[in-house]
Amino acid sequence: MNRSGQVFYQNWLAGIITENEDGYFFQYDENYLQQPYAQGISLTMPLQNQVFSSPALFPFFDGLIPEGWLLDIASENWKINLRDRMGLLLTVCGDCIGAVSIKPVIEENHE
C-alpha cells in the first residue's frame, strides 16, 4: 500500500512524504527549494534535491505524532493502530504545534 502526505512549512508546500513496501521517502518540492524563504524542515533533513529514504518513519516526523493520553484518544477516535505511524501522521498532524503540518494525499481510483 502506498500512502503519501503533503508536508507544509509555514503553510508553504515543502515536500511529500511517502510510505510504500520499501520504506519511507521524503522529497522537497522543486518550487519550494527555489524560494528565498525555503528552510529545511529539520536539521536532519537539510534542503536538497535528493530523496531522503529510511526503512522506518523518519524520527522528525515520528516526533510530530502525539504521545501518552492524547495518542490514546487519537487512536481510539480514528480507530488507528498505535503501530501504524504513517496512518497516525496523516490523520493527526494536519494541525500540529510548530511550523510543520501534514495533509494526506488522496489518491483517486481511476478504473
Enumerate the predicted regions with their spans:
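Phosphate/dinucleotide-binding and metal-coordinating scaffold of catalytic cores
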Residues: 1-111
